[in-house]
Amino acid sequence: MTTVIYPGTFDPITNGHMDIIQRSAVLFSKVIVAVAKNPSKQPLFNLAERVELVQLSVVHLDNVEVIGFDDLLANVVKARQIDAIIRGVRTTMDFEYESQLAHLNRLLTNGVESLFLPPTEQWSYVSSTIVRDIFLHQGDVSRLVPAAVLRALEKRAK
């Protein structure tokens, strides 16, 4: 059984994230989506809300588990005996940054590899930052996020 972890802040989870999760769920026995509390970011949704939104978005995927965490990713990887770390990469800038993290995580986890998955073309431009920006400027994000996220955003706008 191969267990992978897909960490991120997911603020909010987008259809680009869902693309990576769904494809990972086909490739691996178990996928843990790890929603991070990042003190250096000011989130639109708090950690508990983000965990719930991811859970609602992946409910149809039997081999996907969602957790929240505020620890070093390497500690979570070791504690849960994770086989690999999944990272989505859209651009060469993403790849350079993620390569650095992959080297550090390999060192801190005694060899756990990071696997890079590019999103399918239709989601290559989507990011949580872009979704938040469009939403905060009253734009339509309905085609960019799962239904649960759209409902939460609409509720937040009222």
From Swiss-Prot:
Site (Transition state stabilizer): 17
Subunit structure: Homohexamer.
Residues reported to bind ATP: 9-10, 17, 88-90, 98, 123-129
Species per Swiss-Prot/TrEMBL record: Histophilus somni (strain 2336) (Haemophilus somnus)
GO molecular-function term, one example from the UniProt record: ATP binding
Cell location: Cytoplasm
Cofactor: Mg(2+)
Enzyme class: transferase
An annotated GO BP: coenzyme A biosynthetic process
Protein name in UniProt: Phosphopantetheine adenylyltransferase
EC number assigned by the record: 2.7.7.3
GO cellular component, one term: cytoplasm
Function of the protein: Reversibly transfers an adenylyl group from ATP to 4'-phosphopantetheine, yielding dephospho-CoA (dPCoA) and pyrophosphate.
Pfam families per the UniProt record, alphabetical: CTP_transf_like
Gene symbol of the encoding locus: coaD
Residues binding substrate, per UniProt: 9, 41, 73, 87
Primary localization class, coarse: cytoplasm
Catalytic activity: (R)-4'-phosphopantetheine + ATP + H(+) = 3'-dephospho-CoA + diphosphate
Family: Belongs to the bacterial CoaD family.
